[in-house]
Amino acid sequence: MERNLSTVKTLVQFITESQKHVFGASGDLSKILNDIAVAAKIINREVNKAGLLDILGMEGGMNVQNEEVKKLDVYANDQFISALRSGGQCCAIASEENTDIIPIENNGHSKSNYVVLIDPLDGSSNIDVNVAIGSIFSIYRRVSESGPGETVDCMQVGNKQVAAGYIIYGSSTMMVYTTGDGVNGFTLDPSIGEFCLSHPNLKIPEDGFIYSVNEGNYADFPREIQEYIYYCKTPDFETSRPYSSRYIGSMVADFHRNLIKGGIFMYPATAKYPLGKLRLMYECNPLAFIVEQAGGKAIDGEGRILDIEPTNIHQRTGIIIGSKNMVEKVEAFIQMNVGLNVYRLK
């Protein structure tokens, strides 16, 4: 059945209406969100026809994480950088694919007030097998005075974010974001080329029945995570256990499913990665901001993700994120094992 387009609220309309309720809003943040959406549409087009183009596979280089760079990673990175450069509201960009921040000299803009941190293509190891992948972004207000952005602008604690979101490229393409006033999801309607409000005021269920973790690393997990996984697998009628194990290997896809249905995603520190593996600034912080705005929790095993003081743009951390009661159950196991975990080196 065709929808009545007069009842559809596009992302542009939603952002414009929301801006009206913010005293003194300049519109700069709204423009950045729109620029990100434009880049996402272009990336979505290439993702959808990637199997028909010479854009799959390896690009040949290594990124700052010592991971092989895939062609679509490079393409996505270029699109976000181009969109944010041309917009004029962004003074610096930090990306998973770039060792250093990218300062932006905006001629004609006396003061560009924001910095954007991005993971251009999360889950890119799944590109070749047609599994859902995504992009993650985090936005901060600059702390330096003016001119091109500096490292200090990008190295802010997560609770200072002014906006964060992700785009998931799957059976449909969605953009989910927060500006600190709830979480809203928009689905790309290819017939009109616009993101349309499809999931207003998203809330993650307080309880869930899905746990997402790479159990291939079980032997390297801290004791409390091993015990929690055992708890998830143990039958119990009152708590509807055993829970379902669902792990895609794309953080955005796993997180998105758990946000909608309720669940927990875990990528803890391990013996091999004692400081964690996922990146704090452009993976964990933005998703932590979103989940808290949706009523969930995000911790690193010792405290709140959004309270971690960054020391490096590409800093890694463990993360446990999802439904409030499920994360708090992990915290209970952590408390029972205080002093016993040989892997916690922070």
UniProtKB/Swiss-Prot annotation:
The subcellular location is: Cytoplasm
Which InterPro entries does UniProt cross-reference here?
FBPase_C_dom, FBPase_class-1, FBPase_N, FBPtase
Keyword hit for Hydrolase: yes
Q: What is its EC number?
A: 3.1.3.11
GO terms of biological process kind? fructose 1,6-bisphosphate metabolic process; fructose 6-phosphate metabolic process; fructose metabolic process; gluconeogenesis; sucrose biosynthetic process
* One Gene Ontology cellular component: cytosol
Q: In which pathway does it act?
A: Carbohydrate biosynthesis; gluconeogenesis
Q: Please list the residues that bind Mg(2+) 1.
A: 96, 119, 121
For activity, the cofactor(s) needed are: Mg(2+)
Keyword Transferase attached: no
Query: Which residues hold Mg(2+) 2?
Result: 119, 122, 283
Tell me how the cofactor is bound.
Answer: Binds 2 magnesium ions per subunit.
Q: Which CDD domains match?
A: FBPase (cd00354)
Keywords on this record? Carbohydrate metabolism, Cytoplasm, Hydrolase, Magnesium, Metal-binding
Any GO MF annotation of the entry? fructose 1,6-bisphosphate 1-phosphatase activity
Record's catalysed reaction(s): beta-D-fructose 1,6-bisphosphate + H2O = beta-D-fructose 6-phosphate + phosphate
Binding locations of substrate: 122-125, 214, 247, 277
Pfam families the UniProt entry points to: FBPase, FBPase_C
Whom does it interact with, and what assembly results? Homotetramer.
* Entry's family note: Belongs to the FBPase class 1 family.
Q: What is this protein called?
A: Fructose-1,6-bisphosphatase class 1
Species of origin reads Cytophaga hutchinsonii (strain ATCC 33406 / DSM 1761 / CIP 103989 / NBRC 15051 / NCIMB 9469 / D465)
What gene is behind this protein?
A: fbp
